[in-house]
């Protein structure tokens, strides 16, 4: 099933197709933004019912954990963390992963997961990110922890989807079986 939403945000237009799958817990948010804002940060937040002291982030050579609380000045200064395809909050036998196909700024505070979608700063270009954007992020609730739940596999499915192409002239030259 799909739900389509279009919103105006100041001078920008954001259209989303929210996809629900019959045989998957993953919910995809296929987003197109015609972004015209100046010095504005667009984030998505997911407050979740997961209580844990650590979040796990995908990074270029594996994964790492970071604290979810802000007990020290160092914690407060770390308002955003880098990550690649996913971040996860898990406790006991339940968790939620936030997957994405091209966004690298994550934040988590207590049980609130967030992903930076667009940052229209002024350096090095005064019109940075003031253009059309298309990206997908997904929320993936799961049992167990991120490893047992297949979060890495779900992130790869999102980032490298199976593509099909209809070709009526292929014949035996392009057959997998011949």
Question: Where are these predicted regions, by residue range?
Answer:
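C-terminal (or distal) subdomains of carbohydrate-active enzymes
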Residues: 1-178
């Amino acid at each position: 099933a799909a739900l389509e939403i279009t919103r105006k945000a100041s001078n920008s237009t954001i259209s989303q197709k929210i996809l629900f799958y019959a045989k998957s817990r993953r919910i995809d948010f296929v987003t197109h933004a015609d972004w015209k804002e100046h010095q504005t940060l667009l984030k998505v937040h997911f407050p979740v019912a997961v209580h844990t002291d650590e979040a796990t982030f995908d990074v270029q050579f594996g994964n790492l954990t970071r604290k979810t609380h802000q007990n020290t000045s160092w914690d407060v200064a770390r308002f955003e963390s880098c990550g690649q395809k996913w971040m996860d909050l898990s406790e006991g036998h339940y968790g939620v992963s936030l997957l994405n196909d091209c966004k690298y700024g994550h934040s988590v505070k207590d049980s609130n997961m967030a992903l930076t979608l667009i940052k229209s700063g002024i350096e090095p270009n005064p019109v940075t990110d003031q253009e059309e954007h298309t990206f997908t992020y997904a929320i993936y609730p799961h049992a167990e922890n991120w490893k047992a739940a297949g979060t890495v596999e779900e992130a790869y499915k999102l980032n490298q989807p199976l593509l099909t192409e209809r070709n009526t002239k292929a014949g035996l030259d392009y057959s997998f079986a011949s």
